């Protein structure tokens, strides 16, 4: 007895699923310059490796003989694949079927996608377009009632954030629950001019008197600066490549350790120009990204959050092949001071490093927290202590190198002060409770005001204190462990990475990361 008839029926149903929302909807998707969800999976996954679950799930129509006449697939597909040879779970919204909204979705598929990633301990790549299975006002008509809002399965996403790498791509207009899925990730990327992200789109926002286009409301420039997404690129192909690169630094789950990459770059390579990079004039600034690129393995720095919290640069890199989480103060933004946005960015980044067992490297040039009315209105100190708490909760190996400024409470947060952390300083390092500039006026106000020539008195005090704040005086009392030749920075960092590698421990941490 053969079961060929049933297999033929299966193939017929799969053919319906391959048609997505139908030729007209697919054509509209393509005319908008966007790939269909199945094309995206092909581009993301290694060739021929995607194994789909629930392909023929959807809304079926039967004729008078109870024979299937039509099948509209659910607007979410998912399955297992490999990316650069590594197993992953891929899930994607099908915008050609009701714009990805709830009245054409099967919630169990969304939940099982998260469950599969968690159970198999594999990274999840989430391609989001539309409402991501979220509600539509048409749902009231199809169900005959209004639902009390709820998000079944969100607990799975929360668990996954602390267990597996979760990557999200915004590949069109994303709203409501779709926006939440995009934001609830370790790394997110949008497509310039073709993606938009918002809680509610322009037609809804118009009801409160704001008449905006999709890009004006939630385009990539808005969301990069808000920190809602980490990256924006020109094409979907570039977005998929960003995902590949991001995942290359991370383990499959917290139960594994990040893998070592190639060791093609000499770990003892000296960078001669670093000796001249920090200006002696403290009012002059310098570019720190070339310093990062010079000390890490060539071409290995992968920056995230470029437009948000800009006074600290964050990204992944490799040192002698070992993946590390790399932070660096950026003097070009608020002089390197920590703003409220910077604190939020650093908190998430430190939690990410701790979750996935990445040693942290921090190039420090921090004059302190941002000051002034804007800083107070933004709650900078509140965000700052949250960041400090995140740092003090870390157990992952940590290395700080003080390039220039290290002042105040934010300066003190260059490492976890409650445990051993590797620390060096360049000879350009300067530190204290407050910078002399500004601090002198506060500490010596009475003496300056009483002088016949207050300006001359202030200059006299400043000259006297400048002689005392030499980094060598701090080294004499072991307040700084080691002052190094900047040209040796790479070799010392590679030594840190090699020393740290066997100290890393797999498994979940004492706290679970939040998006």
Q: Each predicted region: which residue ranges?
A:
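Ligand-binding clefts of soluble mixed alpha/beta catalytic domains
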Residues: 1-515
